[in-house]
Amino acid sequence: MSSNTHFTPLILAGIAALCGLSVANVYFNQALLPVFAGAMSIDAGQTSWIATASQMGYALGILLIVPLGDRVAPLRLCRVLLAWTAAMLLLASQATQLSFLAGVSFLICMGTCIPQVLLPYLAGLATAGERSRVIAWIQTGLVIGILLSRAIAGWLADHLGWHSVYWVAACVMALCALVLPRILPQRHAPGIPVAYGRLLSSMLHLFWHEPLLRLSCALGAAVFAAFSAFWSVIAFKLMGPPHNMNATEVGLFSLWGALATLLTPAAGKLCERFGTVAISLASIALCCLSFVLSMAWANLFIVLLACANLLSFALQLGQVANQTRIFSLSPESRSRLNTVYMVCNFCGGAFGSALGGYLWLRFGWTGCATLGLLCAVLAMVALLAILRPRSKQLSVV
């Protein structure tokens, strides 16, 4: 397959849009948590379980489904996942209780692992020199989907009720299932002759024997925990004094973070120029800075806007660096490498969402921001600890 033929900007833009629309299902409920609290007469700590269930469902979907990308044609697998997600979204629109909505959110997000099926597939088609650029395109779509989903969900909830968000999302997934064959060229999967059980168990072997995979997992989980802690409680922060926003305004706040995604293609070029270690260091430093600023000036709206932007770009930098690193390890195992990385990533996200909600109830914004800062500091310590004895090894990836 020629990369000049199949990785035109138009093709990559279409795939990035598909990935963004898919991953939006994991995150749009974060803008609705205060709405759920009012509609179901529950507190902020309880609503955080909806976000946590979503991320855990996504992680389990990645763990159980994405490894099939080493065996099954991506087009067929993605169409099945899109149909499943659409059906579960319609079911969620009928929810009246927290437990039911959290359970169905878990099932929705199990099927929303489509971007993680496509990422290793497309990375395998890319040349080594353009791999970072391809990953950066897809990461741009993912983060735009994450951030715009909150804005759109907030607007729909204010004007049509929260049930309408799920109806619209179901229709979008059904449309994506129809459009997908026109965007994604159908190619045969590698067809590794390994039983499904052995395919799953082989991921433990990869994790144990690939130090760069373990490093990427640790960095990704820590930064994503910080990112999730911020976004799981920011709606409560903005809806309370002194900001007193409504759901639409909270959703629009997320649009500021979307500006950072305009820089994501540059992240791919920076990664190719300076290496993954330097980009990982920059990612963690920006994450630390965003939480320090938000703790110092939590009641200044402009500071929170700036922090959202910094944090989004930090996440983008880290993801591009980490996935460039792991996709260089073993060409025949890219889906499983990505599975291990993303499961760790979203377990970190679930941890950040759950603990962020708890700390918000106990200590307010200071507790949540402290959690984010600690996660970033731990990531920095881990990277520096491994970098010292292995600087020559790490500098080449």
Name each model feature, range by range.
Residues 171-190, 382-386:
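C-terminal membrane-cytosol helix-exit motif in multi-pass small-molecule transporters
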Residues 137-182:
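Helix-loop-helix hairpin linking two adjacent transmembrane segments in secondary transporters
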Residues 62-73, 262-276, 360:
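Helix-to-loop junctions at the C-terminal end of transmembrane segments
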Residues 105-142:
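Cytoplasmic helix-loop-helix junction between adjacent transmembrane helices
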Residues 2-5, 185-217:
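Juxtamembrane intracellular "pre-TM" segments in multi-pass secondary transporters
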Residues 114-126, 317-330:
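Intracellular juxtamembrane helix-capping segments at the cytosolic ends
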Residues 60-98:
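Conserved MFS/SLC helix-loop-helix module at the cytosolic interface between two early adjacent transmembrane helices
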